[in-house]
Amino acid sequence: MKSRGLSVSTTNEHPDSQRLLADPLAGSESWWQQIAQWGTPLVEPISEDKVRLTFLWREPVAGADEPTYSRVYIDVNGVTDHHSTHPETLQRLGQTHVWYWQAEVESDFRGSYSFMPVTAEHCLNLPEGTPQERRQAQRNWWISLMDLAQNDPFNHTAPHSSYRGRPLSAVHLADAIPQTAWQPIDAGQQLPTDTQRLQLITWHSELLGNSRNVWIYHTHGTEDNAERPLAILLDGQYWATRQPIFGVLDNETDAGRLPASVYVLIDIIDQPHRSVELPCNQDFWQALQTELLPQVAALQPFTDQASRTVVAGQSFGWVGLAICRITLAAAFWWCAESSPVPSGGRMLIISKL
């Protein structure tokens, strides 16, 4: 998923969620009207640097065309584990149409989330098999839920979507680092793109044996063109078309928070190519360095200093940029799903690539 932010919190604080859930009027129209006024998720401070989030989902009144839901799964970026064989689900509040889920997070949390209500036949039911077979079955099941995902209609921030097109809502807590350039977009507005500074090329890669779109954008500045920093954005089609980032980059540059730079947004072609090229694929990075970047430099010069070059990605894209960084390293370590995580801590070094 994606993280954006306002200069202020986009969720509202409620002093006592347990009292709210115990209210005899819970689930009534007046109760939901109050929720809509507050906005969700509800936020309760529980310590100096932690808060409790309460997510709420309103089940539609069952009708002839309305399914009966058995579970409402929730995916909160950086909080829930979508690899788990026991994924997080909301609880139904008594016999009402209220479903809820709570989590404790840092008070500077920012992230996206979605609800996935399912009928009985869509609930997770893993077959017998090897650990690898069960992991693959779990992954296939999770991907199948993407078409069922919903954003949160009670969230006051404008909804957005993932690179797969999954509907998402955002949480921006009060202590999160300000990202004010996104404020118009979070309010449902669009920022203009200066098309005179946007170039779309087709990268025909002999090494990879494929072709794809690449967007090149440069922001205004007084720096010598040959010294401009370079930023490479993986999943470039998302940032170029689904959630255009060009206006945000202009705003950040004009405000002096970013230097005038050259941005290269690389299309994934499709999901199968993304799954092959981004994680642990040295050929992809070799092709990028020897084929694509010289083409980009001929159109928009940039520095060759590694210290002024950035690669940004998420999920497979994050793995890809990590591989880019450590291609020449003797070893790289990452977390294995089967390894136990120490109580109260995070796993740092588990298995070797």
UniProtKB/Swiss-Prot annotation:
GO terms for cellular component: cytoplasm. SUPFAM superfamilies: alpha/beta-Hydrolases, E set domains. It is found in: Cytoplasm. It catalyses: Fe(III)-enterobactin + 3 H2O + H(+) = Fe(III)-[N-(2,3-dihydroxybenzoyl)-L-serine] + 2 N-(2,3-dihydroxybenzoyl)-L-serine; Fe(III)-enterobactin + H2O = Fe(III)-[N-(2,3-dihydroxybenzoyl)-L-serine]3 + H(+); Fe(III)-[N-(2,3-dihydroxybenzoyl)-L-serine]3 + H2O + H(+) = Fe(III)-[N-(2,3-dihydroxybenzoyl)-L-serine]2 + N-(2,3-dihydroxybenzoyl)-L-serine; Fe(III)-[N-(2,3-dihydroxybenzoyl)-L-serine]2 + H2O + H(+) = Fe(III)-[N-(2,3-dihydroxybenzoyl)-L-serine] + N-(2,3-dihydroxybenzoyl)-L-serine. Its EC number is 3.1.1.108. One of its GO terms (biological process) is iron ion transport. Keywords: Cytoplasm, Hydrolase. The keyword Cytoplasm applies. The keyword Hydrolase applies. One of its GO terms (molecular function) is iron ion binding. Disruption phenotype: Disruption of the gene abrogates enterochelin-supported growth on iron-chelated media. It holds the Pfam family Enterochelin_N. Catalyzes the hydrolysis of ferric enterobactin (Fe-Ent). Is responsible for the release of iron from ferric enterobactin. Belongs to the Fes family. This is Iron(III) enterobactin esterase. It comes from Yersinia enterocolitica.
